[in-house]
Amino acid sequence: MSKAGTWIKMFVVGTVICVGGPALVQAIRPTDEELFKRYNPELQRRSLEEGDRRAQEFDDYVNKLKQWSKSDKSIWVAAQEQQEQMRTQAAVQRSQAKDEAKAQREEMRKELLGEK
């Protein structure tokens, strides 16, 4: 066979592989609806219940990414700063709750002892 024939044959084989492979995968891959129908009823129910919550969490995450990307800093640095801010706020809230509980206990103790 001539060199031109070999080149043509290799071009045809390459095209079949490059086009046929993804086409085959697309043809045999089940759709989301087909996969959902294969679930047992309990998984279907749980998936339907949690679907909205997961979609909302994903939307929140995407919005956070958009917010972080507007910053001059790297997304990872901005995310880390926000996590640190959240930790600080949580620590402040815990300390406030602890102080309120302590004040409430002190007030209850005073009421029990009749000091009020």
Swiss-Prot record:
Any GO CC annotation of this UniProt entry: mitochondrial inner membrane
GO BP term, example: mitochondrial respiratory chain complex III assembly
Chain coiled-coil ranges: 78-116
Keywords per UniProt: Chaperone, Coiled coil, Membrane, Mitochondrion, Mitochondrion inner membrane, Transmembrane, Transmembrane helix
Start and end residues of each stretch annotated as Disordered: 87-116
InterPro entries: Cbp4
Keyword Repeat: no
Biased composition regions of type Basic and acidic residues, renumbered to the chain: 96-116
Membrane topology, as annotated: Single-pass membrane protein
TM region positions: 7-29
UniProt-annotated location(s): Mitochondrion inner membrane
Function: Essential for the assembly of ubiquinol-cytochrome c reductase. It has a direct effect on the correct occurrence of the Rieske protein, core 4, core 5 and apocytochrome b.
UniProt family annotation: Belongs to the CBP4 family.
The protein's name: Assembly factor cbp4
Taxonomic source organism: Aspergillus oryzae (strain ATCC 42149 / RIB 40) (Yellow koji mold)
